[in-house]
Amino acid sequence: MEGEPSQPPNSSWPLSQNGTNTEATPATNLTFSSYYQHTSPVAAMFIVAYALIFLLCMVGNTLVCFIVLKNRHMHTVTNMFILNLAVSDLLVGIFCMPTTLVDNLITGWPFDNATCKMSGLVQGMSVSASVFTLVAIAVERFRCIVHPFREKLTLRKALVTIAVIWALALLIMCPSAVTLTVTREEHHFMVDARNRSYPLYSCWEAWPEKGMRRVYTTVLFSHIYLAPLALIVVMYARIARKLCQAPGPAPGGEEAADPRASRRRARVVHMLVMVALFFTLSWLPLWALLLLIDYGQLSAPQLHLVTVYAFPFAHWLAFFNSSANPIIYGYFNENFRRGFQAAFRARLCPRPSGSHKEAYSERPGGLLHRRVFVVVRPSDSGLPSESGPSSGAPRPGRLPLRNGRVAHHGLPREGPGCSHLPLTIPAWDI
């Protein structure tokens, strides 16, 4: 969210960079600041840090979108929400990271008014959509695990929920988009290394009264950070309590659920808890600075220190969250990890025709249900969540597994180089 402080980070506050102090001319009441906010080593450090998270964000989240969209077995409720998180992270990487980096390096706002509004709006909508999506994931897991007999959330309802999430994100960020504007700072100029002067512009929220900004910041903090994350904590605490209990009878009078299924569900919950926890910690410093600016009554030197050094780091940490989610998926989830590997292997190994097939078996009642196994080639990517592609997914208690993970059915393991021998993966394992 650009222009966080009541006086924007790059406005008429005294700045000192590159060994050149801000100078004020009493006779004309003019203030001159260095064009760049930091020395060359500090600026280089910021550029490398932002470039790293930008590349991680673009590559990782693009792969997540590719894996989920390419494989219809990944079209599940939880994976649709994960896809929505990846889309919001991509928006942050495309529209917010570059402009924020340049804004943190140069004194003043170097872009036009439209970019000022777009950057602030997209960043605010992305963080709002992310936290609302995390709440939706927690609710969906809560219903599946704590109340397994209730009607499951369908894929269609999940897509409607995602549309509502973005509508709410746009609604709550509209005041910021309206008030964000670029203004010229009177009697304040930037001076470059060749002693050329430039007018100073600032991108900031021009509220009619300062108190209105405080109210809006407090509303944002409570509605898109504090309250949603408190709800997530309660949901996952109930889920953890349920998973720690002994497995009960399966629906339809089936035997007790396979303990391995509970462990798999627990791994899914661990991954989702890590995503929510990392989101909380990543955005906490930026929210703390926003509240400090509005309620702290900082002096000019303190505000200079916060805006020139603290805000760039807080922005970087918040943006790093958008880059870390794919790493969390790959670490905790085997199917996403296989999907990442397959995406890179596909460029080296051509995919043969008919490399993807399904096995079906008839279950009691005369209905054909998708069996536990989905036979895929190594070039195929991940598979759906343990909740299954729909509420009618088979119960994990009846799934024959070998070593609790993958049954190879006597096929040799994949050797060096490219191999097209199929691996059988539990389709319900997220």
Swiss-Prot record:
The chain crosses the membrane at residues 44-64, 81-101, 118-138, 159-179, 215-235, 272-292, 308-328. GO terms for molecular function: G protein-coupled receptor activity; neuropeptide receptor activity. Disulfide bonds join C116-C203. One of its GO terms (cellular component) is plasma membrane. It is a multi-pass membrane protein. The keyword Transmembrane applies. This is Neuropeptide FF receptor 1. It comes from Homo sapiens. The lineage of its organism: Eukaryota, Metazoa, Chordata, Craniata, Vertebrata.
